[in-house]
Amino acid sequence: MGTNSEFSPEIDQLKEILISCVLCPRKCKVNRRAGELGFCRLADDVVVSHALPHYGEEPPISGTRGAGTIFLSSCNLKCTFCQNYQISHSISGTVTDVEDLSSIILSLRDAHCHNIELVTPTPHVPHIMEAFLMAQRRGLNLPLVYNCGGYENPEVIHRLKGIVDIYLPDFKYGTEKDALLLSGAKDYPRHAIDSIKEMVRQVGDTLEEYEGIAKRGMVIRHLILPGFIRNSLEVLRLIKTHLSPSVPLSIMSQYTPIPAVKNHPHLGRRITRAEYEHVINYALDMGFENIFSQDENDRALTPDFEKKMPFNWA
């Protein structure tokens, strides 16, 4: 990892992007520093929903003491089925400046978390990276986990080299049709491939662990959607074709219908065991070497952000 002074120009350049915002592929080009709002509805603020030790991530991320997870408000995708819809579809939480966010990061260190995990960081990148570097100057020595939706601008990801230690991107859609239908982002597959390629270039296509705890690398996540199994299979095909079958995959079964889709012909139900096993077996047949899988009990990981503690840890 480089020194803080090395990254100062990168942080300044990220802040400049906010003047005509192209942090994500939607490229709204609004002046967020002047209070203009684009798709994410964020101006020049960081809005924090919750910060807590998270015990429900992949085992090398959560470990025994939890990931130091900061849930950020808003999103550049706003999927119709979003499991975090309470904070992604609206601006919900506390407006937080860089210094206070740095203190939140240090409080998670003091809670003995294994890392600092940023959830939905994309619209907030300039300020949260500045806060993380500030926390490092104040003594932080933990890996940074970038947990994103996969709809990223590769040029922005390039600027995070040496700051982010572990990338945890979603790869939601393998087809433009499904990406447009469910997220209004027809170009999602192309941008997911390009941005994850840049992540791999930075940290490799494996997960480096010490005593079972992730220190560097990446895991690609995919949430299986009921009735969209062909989409899942196409995601796996794209990963193998454009990335590598050695990259760790987290294939998730925890989909829970939210109120907005309760009457949807497919999304209004949970996935079946047969659907999940179909996708897992396809991944194995394609030669993927490192797969994190879930059992049906993990569906309880769906949060309720209206509560002070959004998860019910067993």
Task: Please state what every model-predicted region is.
Residues T80-N84, S90-V95, I128-A131, V156-I157:
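Short, conserved acidic/polar surface loops in the N-terminal third of protein domains
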Residues M1-N76, T80, N84-H89, E306-N312:
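N-terminal [4Fe-4S]-dependent radical SAM core
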Residues S102-P265:
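Conserved AdoMet/S-adenosylmethionine-binding subsite of the radical SAM
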Residues M1-E36, D205-A314:
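Auxiliary Fe-S-binding modules of radical SAM enzymes
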Residues Q86-N115, Y282:
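Conserved alpha-helical substructure of the radical SAM core
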Residues D97, P123-H124, D298-R299:
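Positions that flank functional sites
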Residues T94, V98, A185, P189, ...:
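Flexible, glycine- and charge-enriched loops at secondary-structure boundaries
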Residues V30, S88, T122, Y173, ...:
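Flexible, active-site-proximal loop/turn residues at the rims of small-molecule/cofactor binding pockets
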